Amino acid sequence: LLPVFLLIIGSVRAVESPKREIRAVWLTTIYGLDWPKKPATTEAGRKAQQQELCTILDQLADANFNTVFLQVRLRGDVIYRSAIEPASKTFSGKYGTMPGYDPLAFAIEECHKRGMECHAWFVTFPVGTEKAVKEQGKLSVVKRNPKLCKRHNGEWYLDPGVPETADYILSLVKELVNGYDIDGIQFDYIRYPEQAKTFPDKAVHQKYGKSTRLPDWRRENINKMVYRIYDWVKQAKPWVQVSSSPLGKYNRIERVPNAGWTAYESVFQDPKMWMQKGKQDMIVPMMYYLHDNFFPFVDNWVENCNGRLVVPGLGAYRMDKSEADWTVNDITDQIDYSRYYGGAGCTFFRCANVLDNSKGLYNELKDNYYKYPAQLLPLTWLNDRIPDSPEGICVE
């Protein structure tokens, strides 16, 4: 397979830079990986945090990026004002304490000033390590809603099989969408955890789904929640885009039967069904692989997208020598292929791995691949209603 795909790549390098495409980064706030560098306890510290973000956004704007996926819910803690979950300690140094400003509101305003969209990146089911849950104390969802939570491999998760879990997630979504001028909401970890076979939900399955096979029941738990969230968002603010970042390989396809870790089989995630049902605006699969493990899976996503946007997530972090020591060409080959075969753009994990210009990636994007600005793509399925005739207009 590999020589075939390399031959194809050689033939698509001349693709013109699209006039419309998504050019995005995942901007990570957990542990302050991308932002902020340190918590703020003084006015000077707050201003330093804000300036940090402005510098990041300026660099992205200079390279004609047009979308930021900002991590707003980390592990049962958030970076915005919430009546439901505690503020993250990332910004203030203490759970439940805001840093003296609203990081999400500030980020939205600054993105919009630069003509960029700001999507709320929302970690769905993981709610913290034992240490984090203990540190959050009574503020933790594990303490406040123990019925919803399960401990698995030393971490805590909301259990998708408990019906009230969907109610809880939807309450967070409502608070976020109603309270902020976000352009979209993107669901991460909207799946069962790693080593899902040992996830302790047998009793819940017996109570709520014993007539259905466990794998099918698990997938349907997530499906129903996805549909419910999408329908609510489109009723409340139709222009807010709903997306997810599933595993990069949907299932074991004929072209790559030994695909390994997949969304459908391994973590009971069925994003193709979500698209077929029209319950996603965009799918952003985490495709941190090379060659045979990348190219055919791009095809697979695009072939099954039902007209929705497919935005491959590229592993810029894999260029690090401590990771996989990828080359710049490894990344640009993936951009070329995605453009040629129907992708709606690309996003990079993570922001700092682009802006630090590792192996010249930032310069390559700024000077070549993103040399000219690109508009975002129209969401045509949201505009299929004929507008009402204007009323109350008189011509003198």
Regions inferred by a protein language model and the residue ranges of each:
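Active-site-adjacent "subsite" loops/lids of carbohydrate-active enzymes
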Residues: 20, 28-50, 119-120, 125-175, ...
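Aromatic- and glycine-enriched glycan-recognition loops and surfaces
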Residues: 42-63, 90-114, 168, 220-228
